[in-house]
Amino acid sequence: MNLKPLDVEKYKEFATAKFKERNKHLDAAIIGELFARFGGVTSYIQRVMNVLFLKTPEQGTCTLDMVDDAINYNLNMASDTYETLLRQMPEKQRNVFIAISAEGEARSVKSGAFAKKYHLPSPSSVNSALKGLLEKDFITQEGDAYVVYDKFFDLWLKKYMK
């Protein structure tokens, strides 16, 4: 079951109040930035906000320049898990998964051009890899595009699989 994203203004009010309770200040632009980066998906925003809250000292201000560090902290904490998941994937699925991440929103993944661009086997092999990745919820289909389901896993791939 997918929940609708929260209203950005309501989340700003909530987060600002939580920071104020502990004598901390939150730059309001942070919430808008996180909503933009994570499409309003609360679980990702909350994980970053938890780190930002912990790293903001009492009487201090949480600023926009702290966001990337907080995201990287989350990526580093999950790195072993992502590495294990990637290693446990069958090779064809892993290669298709990495290709989808590289594209961001991968379209025409069953085409020969996509397979050639990412040095993948035949389009039929890509198709069977897609089925496995969809069944395991590593990817999702949004219209005519495939995307990595876990946004932190996607960011981790982009950071470490260059």
PLM regions with names:
Residues 40, 44-121:
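Winged-helix-like regulatory helical subdomains adjacent to P-loop NTPase cores
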Residues 118-135, 143:
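Short amphipathic alpha-helical interaction segments
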Residues 152-162:
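Short, amphipathic alpha-helical interaction segments positioned at domain boundaries
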Residues 7-8, 52, 153:
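Conserved nucleotide-binding/hydrolysis micro-motifs of P-loop NTPases
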Residues 144-151:
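Minor-groove-contacting beta-hairpin "wing" of winged helix-turn-helix DNA-binding domains
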Residues 1-36, 57-60:
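Helix-loop-helix "sensor" segment of P-loop NTPases
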